[in-house]
Amino acid sequence: KRQVLLKDFDKNGFVFYTNLKSDKSKAIKNSSKISMCFHWKSLQRQIRVIGIASKVSKKEADEYYKSRAYGSRIGAWASQQSSILKKRDDLYKSIKEFKKKFPDQKKVPRPEYWSGWRIKPKEIEFWLDGQNRIHERLKYIKKTKSWKKVLLSP
C-alpha cells in the first residue's frame, strides 16, 4: 500500500508521478493491476478504483515536470526516494550540489528515473456510509464501450 498524490485525471485514467526506483514503482512493475482509494471521512464517502497501470509518455512526464517548482525539480534529483539516510544533512548537501549543477531554474532536466503512472480504471466503486452499517455501494464495471452499474450489498 502506498500513498500518492493524484495529479491529473481524464477519460484515459488517473495519473500520479514518482521516482521509478521507488517501492511503489517496483510493485507496479511486478503487477500492473492496482487499486487506489479516495476516502473522505468527514463526508462519509469513499471511492475505490481498480485498474491497470502503465507509464505515461516521456512527453507527458516532461510537460508535468517542467510545471513543477524549481525546488521540487531539484528534489527529484537530490532525493533517492525511500532510501535510508544516515543523517538529514546528507539530503541538504545533495540539494545544494544539484542547485549548483542546475543554477538556471528553467533548465533542470527531468531525471530518467522520474515519471508518471496512469491507472486505467476497470472498476470504480462508490461507498456511502449508511446508518447501522447499511451502507450504499455502487460499482461500475468497464465494458468494451460502456460501464455496467451494479448495486452491492453492504
Name each model-derived stretch.
Residues K1-P154:
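Binding-site signature for planar aromatic cofactors or substrates
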